[in-house]
Design a protein with these regions (language model features):
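Active-site-adjacent beta->alpha loops and helix N-cap segments on the catalytic face
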Residues: 1-6, 12-26, 46-52, 67-84, ...
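Surface-exposed amphipathic alpha-helices with a cationic face
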Residues: 25-32, 59, 79-83, 133-143, ...
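Hydrophobic faces of well-ordered beta-strands that scaffold small-molecule active sites
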Residues: 37-41, 65-67, 89-93, 113-115, ...
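Short, ordered loop/turn segments at secondary-structure junctions
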Residues: 42, 69-72, 94-95, 118-120, ...
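Short, electropositive alpha-helical surface patch
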Residues: 43-63, 164-175
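Histidine/lysine/aspartate-rich catalytic loop segments that bind and position anionic ligands
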Residues: 86-123
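Catalytic cores of alpha/beta
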Residues: 97-108, 149, 153-171
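Catalytic cores of soluble, metal-dependent hydrolases
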Residues: 171, 177-186, 192-199, 203-204
Length: 204
């Protein structure tokens, strides 16, 4: 979506490297070793860095990874390396994923399943809670892996609605957290204050 796209532009303009990003995650892990870490990125970032090198660098630092553009049909080699290093490859399932494909994805699911609440771009607005509940409930019949809902969740109201109106095991918030950085006029200290307040608000 536009928010994540804009943040990516800022990172590129600042010449942030993959190695610097991984070092930051490593430091965060040291500061909070009781917190699970899952990273989300595109396959080309990993390939350019070197798949084996990337996985070696995140071993023991992250618990899972979401490679948003890695097709299920082409994941075998990458997944094998991740499994060997105890890193979960998080599966993405959308309203457009048919039952046969869902079964294939869920068979290999570890950590949690990321259910995309709506078609379109991240940070979208309207959510159909009845449809989300129907689809999440169907997925939960096929797996014991927790099913979390993401896309379009940007407020306490949204979080409460997912909690009360669906059978989801949790929520995923991305764009809204980045938006808070822009709300803080990219002032880091102000951002941390706003972010902490927001996270406390959406905790269920």
């Amino acid at each position: 979506g536009p928010i994540i796209q804009e943040s990516s532009k800022i990172a590129l303009k600042s010449k942030i490297t993959t190695k610097q990003s991984l070092n930051l995650i490593k430091q965060l892990r040291k500061d909070s070793n009781q917190t699970s870490f899952v990273i989300m990125c595109y396959l080309n970032t990993v390939q350019k860095y070197g798949i084996k090198k990337f996985i070696s660098n995140i071993k023991g630092i992250v618990d899972g990874i979401i490679l948003v553009d890695l097709p299920f049909e082409e994941e075998a080699e990458t997944k094998k390396l991740l499994d060997k290093n105890n890193i979960h490859l998080i599966k993405l399932i959308s309203p457009m994923t048919d039952r046969i494909r869902s079964k294939l994805l869920l068979k290999e699911a570890k950590g949690f399943v990321y259910y995309i609440s709506a078609t379109g771009i991240t940070g979208s607005n309207k959510l159909d809670y009845s449809e989300i509940n129907k689809n999440v409930s169907s997925l939960k019949k096929l797996t014991k892996t927790p099913v979390l809902v993401g896309f379009g969740i940007k407020s306490k109201k949204d979080a409460l609605a997912i909690s009360k109106k669906t059978n989801a095991d949790g929520i995923i918030i991305g764009s809204a957290l980045i938006q808070k950085y822009f709300d803080a006029k990219m002032n880091f200290n102000k951002y941390i204050t706003i972010l902490r307040k927001f996270i406390n608000e959406v905790k269920i």
